[in-house]
A protein has these predicted regions:
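Hydrophobic alpha-helical segments
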Residues: 1-168
């Protein structure tokens, strides 16, 4: 059974600490998040997490996922240029399809998911991968909303400690 995160692990200036208020739901949410994140290549997942977090203005998730991307071998150049991925020559067609789909689903309030984004997705991803990627986009958007909504800012090292407890 997962023990509760310590104060050091949740160094946040939060309006509300969901880990303290709803620990079993947060454990389940983290388990889902980890399962989805492991279902596609790590480099792609980190780009998706960063791009959605840029759109949503989530400092917590940007801090965490840019660090994780670097640790997994992502280059500074690709991280810096991610918000301008359409103009930058450093992304594969598969990454471009994933980033386009990420933007379409993250910006639903600006209109429906664009047919062009889905066509690009279909060209690069199997149907199963399309579902996995869509779930990943939903997960990171959920984390963004928790972090922004409740004012969470968790140190990336502390987040790893919490993830390890969930995995145990």
């Amino acid at each position: 059974m997962m023990s509760e995160p310590t104060e050091k692990e949740t160094t946040m200036t939060a309006k509300l600490d969901p880990f303290a208020v709803a620990p079993s739901l947060m454990k389940s949410w983290m388990g889902t998040s980890m399962a989805v994140a492991s279902s596609l290549e790590a480099s792609l997942i980190e780009l998706v997490k960063i791009r959605a977090s840029q759109i949503n203005g989530c400092a917590n998730c940007l801090n965490m996922h840019t660090k994780e991307a670097r640790e997994k071998g992502e280059t500074e150049q690709r991280i810096y240029l991610l918000s301008a991925w359409r103009e930058a020559p450093y992304y594969t067609d598969r990454e471009r399809a994933a980033l386009g789909w990420t933007e379409a689903l993250t910006r639903l309030s600006e209109g429906h998911a664009h047919a062009g984004a889905y066509e690009a997705l279909k060209a690069e991803f199997t149907e199963e991968e399309q579902v996995k990627l869509t779930l990943m986009i939903n997960v990171i958007n959920g984390w963004n909303r928790l972090a922004v909504g409740f004012g969470l800012f968790v140190d990336p090292e502390a987040a790893k400690s919490i993830q390890a407890k969930v995995a145990a």
